[in-house]
Amino acid sequence: MLRRGRLHVLLALVLAVAVLSAQRAPRPNPILILVSFDGWRYDYIDRLPAPNLRALAARGARAKAMIPSFPTLTFPNHYTIVTGLYPAHHGVVANVMTDASIGARFTMSAETAKDPRWWGGQPLWVTAIAQGRRAAAMFWPGTEVEIQGVRPTYWTPYAKPITSYDRARRVVQWLSLPEGERPSFITVYFDEVDTAGHDYGVDAPELSAAAEHLDDSLGQMIAGVHALGLDDRTTFVIVSDHGMTPLSMDRVIYFDDYVDPETVDVLELHGFLALAPKDGNVDALYRKLRGKHPALAVYKREQTPARLHYRGNPRIAPIIAIPKEGWAATTHRRIENRPLERGAGEPDLRAPMEPIGLRKSETPALHAPPVASDGRLW
């Protein structure tokens, strides 16, 4: 009896230790893969060769489209997606901007863009790392910068020649790392469709070919997740920063018909105008442009429409001029015979959600606490 009693006690202790060990075993981190198809218009999913994207949407949730933040440019909108802040609030208000307090000019390719003072808010990779997770970036605006002293655990400097297939392959390589080294948040950026759209147009066969390449790359990542047995813990979020609107050469506003371009600093052209008078006389420039063309709305910085949420930041150009959808604004000297351009005032990506809301939907997928943002969930 004594031996049997001891055996029972010993067995109970073993079971208790096993239960405690199971309770203490850490659950594997969920994985969030944020994918951007730059320039992917709201209707491309239904009319271009994208079977992997359509299959992914059928298994999950899909919005009809997304309303980009103003301005509908690559850097402002991509950073809005990961911070949940409007461009005027996170500070990256355009692809080209100036800041007197920094004493520099920001452009997408300049070394000055790597100064963390340009980048406000807390992007998702910083949030993930603050929670003890690892993050990886296969290109994304801001990931080459030490924001709040943090870069992604793994990141690749932007290089356009790196193909879509190689970008997808790098993502699968990161996912193949051992559990303790594997990133649980990954961004990957594809620009092939955007380039084809600008160069050839929204109905060109080159655009269809680019879409097929991107969809194949998405399929490559999905297959990699499946092969690694990570299906149940991986969430894909596919986004775009803006759409495309066809233009004709008879819908071009030449602002140098009204203003000498040598007297202004032209920060943005085509989709909208961002202008700073070199002599500092904002009122004079405003009077020269306002009401001069029926398809061009002209505003001072603090008078832009409230719906644009594009006020209150000194990096915003003193004069903002927005063409109607389907129009472009440029100069006679700089006109480029492009078949289309992204919209600005009424962008051709329209539907029930905005990129500021994505941050609130992405954070729970990381099991991370929320941070302050401009977004809301419907």
Regions found by a protein language model. Name each.
Residues 39-44, 66-68, 110-115, 125, ...:
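Second-shell loop/turn segments in exported
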Residues 28-33, 59-63, 131-136, 180-186, ...:
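Loop/turn elements at helix/coil->beta-strand transitions in domains of secreted/extracellular proteins
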Residues 85-201, 205, 330:
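His/Asp/Glu-rich, glycine-adjacent segments
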